[in-house]
A protein has these predicted regions:
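Short alpha-helix boundary/capping motifs
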Residues: 44, 137, 191-197
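ATP-dependent adenylation/nucleotidyltransferase module used to activate substrates
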Residues: 1-171
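Iron-sulfur (Fe-S) cluster-binding segments and ferredoxin-like electron-carrier domains
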Residues: 183-186, 192-217
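A polyampholytic, Gly/Pro-enriched intrinsically disordered region
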Residues: 86, 171-177, 196-201
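Immediate flanking context of iron-sulfur cluster ligation sites
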Residues: 169-189
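Short clusters of hydrophobic/aromatic residues that line enzyme substrate/ligand-binding pockets
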Residues: 69-70, 75-77, 179, 201, ...
Length: 218
């Protein structure tokens, strides 16, 4: 499955690994937050492994630089002009990101003879490359192109982020990272992603264990 250091994919790894072997794949694109995100994912996976209750394969890292597509001045690459807490969710959209990441992961699945690719997409994701139609068409296209059946799954497609938090409330969610401008590995507390995270914990009725810059937890 495509994995990041964020809440959604971390919980999905844990849920799927209760009943099957999961092969987490992280794709490095050169985005400003990736170093902190990948470190967070590593910590979370190690914590799962220490619990010895889930079957998770070693993390696979792939490379797909997006600077030629977005330009090095784009906020996602430069870290400057990151959408703030009050910005619309659409301001976070990175054109074709799920298509790009999914394509690379699908090739890996085909070569490794893994028949399914899981994505941690949520029901309130408004972007065109997160719709049921996209997932269906992408699965068909990938299977045809690779000559191998690839089932593209989105188990959380009907859930909101607060439901995912409730589902994973017994997991070490403090190890996850959902931030577009992390500071020394911590959430900045000011970007759209941090705002979304705070709101989701509040709606879930679960204490937010996140360490935000400035030392504040909510």
């Amino acid at each position: 499955m495509l994995a990041s250091g964020g809440l959604d994919s971390a919980v999905l790894v844990a849920v799927l690994a209760r009943r099957q072997r999961v092969h987490p794949v992280y794709v490095r694109c050169g985005l400003a937050w990736e170093r902190a995100e990948e470190a967070a994912l590593g910590r979370f996976l190690r914590a799962l492994g220490a619990a010895r209750r889930r079957d998770v394969a070693p993390l696979v890292r792939l490379e797909l630089p997006v600077a030629p597509l977005y330009g090095r001045r784009h906020w996602s690459l430069s870290g400057r002009g990151v959408p703030g807490a009050r910005a619309a969710l659409a301001s976070n959209y990175l054109p074709g990101r799920n298509l790009l990441l999914g394509s690379l992961a699908a090739v890996y699945c085909a070569r490794a003879r893994i028949p399914a690719l899981a994505l941690a997409l949520l029901g309130d994701n408004p972007f065109p490359d997160a719709t049921p139609a996209f997932l269906r068409d992408f699965g068909r296209c990938a299977s045809r192109a690779l000559g191998a059946p690839i089932r593209v799954r989105a188990p959380f497609r009907r859930l909101a982020k607060e439901a995912v938090i409730r589902l994973g409330r017994d997991l070490p969610l403090e190890l996850t990272l959902s931030c577009a401008r992390p500071r020394a590995g911590r959430h900045c507390g000011k970007c759209t992603k941090c705002a979304e995270r705070r709101t989701a914990f509040a709606r879930a009725g679960v204490a937010d264990p996140t360490s935000y810059a400035g030392g504040r937890r909510e």
